[in-house]
């Protein structure tokens, strides 16, 4: 049995899959299996993968039904005969020591369910502001505590940079198909079961950005789908016995959270916002107050739902001055 099985789904990736697979087969950790799922390609991807398998016995090729990444991953997982399952995408490039360092981290810390790594976006001509901010935020999450604090801000691990303990993956139910991002759904379920998540400080993946990225084109990655996932997590855990919360943020994101929480029987008793046009009014039946009155939120779980660049840092500082403690009194959810 290999030390790690790398699961690589591919669909119409003939231009990039050879380099992606080569970056795995050239890892300093040689004791690996590469499980490739050709998910209904029509551009020659399958032929490229078959030739790789003919040259390297560590490569297995499976034909998928072309029904999406979650099903392809579930199909491939059945062929991953290793204690650690690592992910790889067909258009990215892993750095040579990626798997060795991730295996070392998982062996050193049994509480870790999954470990990612810092990433570098490429090619530069396609990289846009939102992805730059996301990568900078994610690259700052290099301890389990960092990830726990920011778990509900965004997906805290890059899927193709992750290595997952197989026992934790199976206990969480593996990858699920649904109207949500399958990777973030998995991270939340791993955390819900007590698994710790982190990213290694070294840069270990070149992560391709392109106008066709699913996060830009697939409705499963829309704001409302992320909010629904987060609220489901909150309702099962931190808010399981609560029927009212306070929300910092009366904009689009705050409203989305208010609606998603109400659908789960949790109402908003107070909104906090810096916009003077909103202060003094009501929203979803709750008063909107300024930051100076955040003390009115005491006794209620406070969710910070402001995604504007730089806002989270300022709000954390304001709440610290007001005596609020993160994860005990409030959580950032955007």
Where are these regions (language model features)?
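Short aromatic/hydrophobic "clamp" motif used to bind/position activated sugar donors
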Residues: 85
